Amino acid sequence: MGVYIVDSNFFIQAHRETYPLDVAFSFWNKVKELAIEGKIISIDKVKDEIYNKNNALEAWCKENLPDDFFKNTTDVISEYQQVVGWAVSKSAHYSPNAINEFLDADEADAFLIAFAMEDTASRTIVTQEVSNPKMKSKIKIPEPCAIFNVRFIKAIEVFRELRETF
């Protein structure tokens, strides 16, 4: 069985929109359980996106996620370079701002894809982003995933695939 690599929007959208921390305890308990079991993980860049807000979500993550939940991406530089090459090759389609944002060293998306590329047989990205190949103003995670054979699914599908309920 593989591992699910969660994007920052897995946490942020759940907290803001569908499963607020103060209401949906069972969801967050299940997230904690899956994290402790190593079924879901994330990367250092996602941690950086979540841990700069000084809010309830950041506090929950610090208190409930295992110390090794956020994996280091320094070992996926070769894969990251492939993602960079792809993004730059799409300059006739995407706006310069879209490419620059996608490749910003502080943004997680390109690094998530690179991390998953290191082992496409067992790593699946979890994101709420939806494919929109005609969009020129933003590179969505599904577009490069399709190019690099990286599997991606929405958050609720993780629970279905793992046959988990909350």
Name the predicted role of every residue range:
Residues I5-V6, I41-I43, I125-T127, I153-K154:
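A structural signal for short, well-ordered beta-strand segments and their strand-loop junctions
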Residues A121-T124, V130-F166:
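Acidic, PIN/NYN-like endoribonuclease modules and their adjacent C-terminal/linker elements
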Residues M1-V3, A14, P20, A35, ...:
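Feature 3881 marks metal-assisted phosphotransfer/nuclease machinery
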